[in-house]
Amino acid sequence: MATANTSSGSMNGVGPVTMDSSTSGASREARIATHSHIKGLGLSDDGTALPSAQGFVGQKAAREACGLVLDLIRMKKFAGKALLLAGGPGTGKTALALAVSQELGHKVPFCPMVGSEVYSSEVKKTEVLMENFRRAIGLRVRETKEVYEGEITELTPTEAENPLSGYGKTIAHVVIALKTVKGTKQLRLDPSIYESIMKERISVGDVIYIEANTGAVKRVGRSDAYATEFDLEAEEYVPLPKGEVHKRKEVVQDVTLHDLDMANAKPQGGQDIMSVVGQLVKGRRTEVTDKLRGEINRVVDKYIEQGIAELVPGVLFIDEVHMLDMECFTYLNRALESTISPHVILATNRGQCMVRGTEYEGPASGTGIVAPHGIPLDLLDRCMIVRTMPYEKDEIREVLRLRAKVEGHLIAEDALEKLTEEGVSSSLRFALQLLSPSSILAKTAGRSEITIKDIVEANELFIDARRSAKVLMSIGEATTEAVPMETS
């Protein structure tokens, strides 16, 4: 659901944190992603955009517009509409969509996709779109369960003669004693629960809970009374549970409609060898039928009416939406009007261009329907369009300063100014990409701070798109002069 691939070190803007080799192997160096510094839209209490807040710099009008859309989403008045972010490359369209998802919270599903993802040789384009639509719709299920919870003080399996095999024995039942702060209770459980206990590797001293209805067993951790037993142990110690052993517990589960589709489309097989081999051999990607989705929708509606579940519309972000064709746009029109639909955010960097899938064949080949942003007008009418503007020089400087802080680089003021000039002359993305190579060059020279010399050297080693185009043009002219065209 939503997406949080970065650790807390990078999100707080303190740079990558390298753990000592003596610490746990689970600790890893924090990965700095492209939008690690974005934590929200950076709006004040009255909805106006701050100059620089929550990792966002500039784009005040676009941020304020997204703030209004955010209020509409929270009030559930954005159904049947879509938000279109239109602007040049590197103007913060993806960052705006990510900021909206973070403002909504991690419990609201956020499903990003690119327009070219719909083209597959195995699945229809409309099926890929519907899958992503269902991924962006969450279902919060509240269920009251009867559970037995406590620390295991006794675990005794009772064996009995197996009438089907000669001298073999089988588990008849298992006796478990659970202890809490209030008291102890002894349980006599089914042998199938003993199999679950063996799979979880549960032993005396572990804190577990058993669901009374389903018989599911979950290991919570090791009792903290055993914390002094071993000096080196990768174990999670938990306190002794309070209250009675047998209690009622409210469990909240967050799933998406796509999870329900997959669970019903691919049910788990049996324990026989053919079922196991069938699960190992991955087949072709299959489509979920409309009939199955309709049945799931009916069950979901029933749960919502009974108050068991709550529908959580998430955000579907389609980047490079101009890559979709006419069939996909027609399908989007219908999907936006359906009763169960997420909030859709589209992004494109195209102006007037041809709608994909409308090219004519024959004498007029290469021509088709030209529309703003490469989107048909009937879908464009449903969109609230937000324009992103190119960054000014001061804003580029602030973004570079912020990224240097997040990535843990020390940079001199004159070097930052030189990098800002590169961002103005080429692009902000190219200037950001020069940060890490410049840092490595500075460390190679024995400096902890990036200087203007490192920026110049990195700029000579790596060229931007405009310089690359000029080099290719000059090479092309030289080749044309050196090798004349042959004439018959």
UniProtKB/Swiss-Prot annotation:
Localization, UniProt: Nucleus
Assigned EC number: 3.6.4.12
Top-level lineage group: Eukaryota
Catalytic activity as recorded in UniProt: ATP + H2O = ADP + phosphate + H(+)
SMART domains membership: AAA (SM00382)
Gene Ontology molecular-function annotations: 3'-5' DNA helicase activity; 5'-3' DNA helicase activity; ATP binding; ATP hydrolysis activity; DNA helicase activity
Ranges for region Disordered: 1-29
GO cellular component, one term: Swr1 complex
Record keyword ATP-binding present: yes
Pfam families hit by this protein: TIP49, TIP49_C
Signal peptide coordinates: none
Biased composition (Polar residues): 1-11
Keywords associated with the record: Activator, ATP-binding, Chromatin regulator, DNA damage, DNA repair, Helicase, Hydrolase, Nucleotide-binding, Nucleus, Transcription, Transcription regulation
CDD domains according to UniProt: AAA (cd00009)
GO biological process, one term: regulation of transcription by RNA polymerase II
Quaternary structure note: May form heterododecamers with RVB2. Component of the SWR1 chromatin remodeling complex, the INO80 chromatin remodeling complex, and of the R2TP complex.
Sequence similarity: Belongs to the RuvB family.
PANTHER family: RUVB-RELATED REPTIN AND PONTIN
Protein known as: RuvB-like helicase 1
Name of the gene: RVB1
